[in-house]
C-alpha cells in the first residue's frame, strides 16, 4: 500500500523504497488538491459557469487506486482555502460488499474514512452497488475492469446505467437534458377539492398532462441536439462518449448521444403529500403509499415515453440545492 511513513529507523533498500513512496504520496496529494481547485475555478460551462462535475470512486483495491482515493478524501476533509467546503466535484462513494463495506473487505478502512469525511464535508454521497437494481450480471470481483459494470451517478441524483441502445454501463454515457416538475404546485391547485379521492384523481390527471408535455419538450430538445456534428466536440467525440470513435468529423452525433438519458425530475414530494392528505410520507402509512404511487406513475410514464420516442427516459429526484 502507498502510505506515507516516517523514515526514522529504516535503512538500505527499505529506506529508499519508502522515500520514493512518500514522495509519490505527496505528489498524489498535491494533484488531488489541484483537481479540486480546478473543478471549482474553471468557468468553461455555458454562461461562464463552473463545470458541474462529479466523480465516483471507492472500489479500486489496487495500491495506486487506494492511494488516489485516500488523498482525495484527505484533501476533501481538510477543505480548500481557509478550510472551506468545496462544492465540486460532487463525490460519490460506491459501496460494495466484498470490496469496501465489511471489516474484512480490502477497502473497508477507506469506507470508514469516507464516512468521517462525509460527516464533516457532506461529501462523498453514497451509492449502494448491492441494491438489486444496481447489480450487473457481468460484475466479477477478480475482473480488473469490473468498474464497467458498476453503477455511477452524475451529481448526487442522476443515475445512468440501463441502456436501450447498447451496453448497460455508466462508462461513456451521460444525461443529455432534464426538466423538473413541481408537483407541489399541482397538489396546491387541487386543494380546493373537498373529497379526498377526487382530489387525488385530479392531481394525477394534471400530472399526466405535465408528464406528456415534459417528455415532448425533452424529445424536441434532443431533435435539436442531435443535429450537431462530431467535429464540434473534439474531446467528447474522440475518446469519451461510447461509440464516438466510429463517427467521422461531419457525422451527426445522434447515434452516440441517444445512448445517454433524458431526465424527468420531480420536486417537493413531502409537501405535495401534505397538500393532498394533510400529512407527509414519514407521518402516515397512507401518505407513504400515495407517494409511492406518484413516483411509480413517473417511472411507468418514463417507460412509455422511452418506447414512443425511442430514448432513454429516466426519473430523478431534483434536490434544488
Task: Please give the residue ranges for each predicted region.
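Conserved catalytic cores of very large enzyme subunits
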Residues: 1-259, 279-280, 284-321
